[in-house]
Amino acid sequence: EIQFIMDGKKYVARNLWMYPLGTIGRDMMYQLFSSFMWTFILLTKGLTAGQIAAVTGIMIGARIFDAFNDPIMGVIIEKTKTRWGKFKPWLAIGMILTVGVIITTFAVDVTGWAFVGLFGAMYFAYSITYTMHDISYWGMIPALSSNPGTRDKYSSRAVLFAGIGSTLAGMLIPMLTVGDGAIGGSTNSGYAWVAVGISVLSLIFICFTIFGVKEVQEDEVKDSSTLVTNKKEAQPVKKDNNGIKKMIKVIAKNKPLLWIIVAFLLQQIGNGLITSGIGSTYIYFQYGFNGGNYSLFSTIGVAATAVLMVLYPTISRNVPRKKLMTILLIVGLIGYAIMGLCTVHFLPLNIEFWVLTAGFTLSNFGQYGIYLVMMISILNTV
């Protein structure tokens, strides 16, 4: 037992690298499918107004579907029992299936209503497959440690590495798909090859988590080792039979979690509008179809958040969470105000671009800081 506890401490140091490395590729996939989907469609498919409306309806329908899909998948994962645990099998299955969905979406060359049909099938499939590995990935944190401080370390480092993946994708995808740097000489071939490349990288990175992470709850091991000295005296612990109804009741009674869910929803809507919709489209149409412009815009904006992710463990020990949320909210609002002023076009175009980028940097700093605080808060309220 003593050796096992010592190994548990060793696993924490290893897990702090193996766990976050796994999400670099996941977030590159997420960026490609979420932030660049509309850009891909607008630049390569030549859809009619009716077809674009159909695509929009599919996206909205998939988001509504997620509201039911996510909790159901959470229960399925929770009930999973295998020799590899309940998280890693779904990590592997979800990643492999998501890779297939992404390559099919970006590499199959169809247009018109044929594309709309393919897109509908792939978009809903993506909602299912990405949820498989996303819930299992973030759900693994409580299984790594029951100590809130240790969980904070896992969460902040995972978000940092997720930011690295997002930054790499945001920097490379525009450069490799639009303009002179497009792989294969066209935007169509550029997106196809980028989808393949990111898919391969995502499978490589997730292997660090699947094969390198050891699920050890140090504190529970210590408690059990001190309280139970005779194995014959140990009694089996009856596990709760969690289901959808019980989960809904638990969430409904957990007021802190309910408020966090509402805040999370609003934060994600705002973030999605700026980075996944308006942001990339506005940059392309206002400043030209040069992939380098959007690469600069997204890279500088996202890179600023890396500072927060690195310093978060220190900040969280010295700044109360409520005060930190207030500061981050103010910073984000200032950034959005600057971006809004840029749409008035009172500056020369080249200067306006850099002012817009500065605004995005501030807004992104606030957005991702709030995301990190809420992510940790959810883990601590469950």
Regions found by a protein language model. Name each.
Residues 1-382:
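Membrane-embedded alpha-helical bundles of multi-pass transporters/translocases
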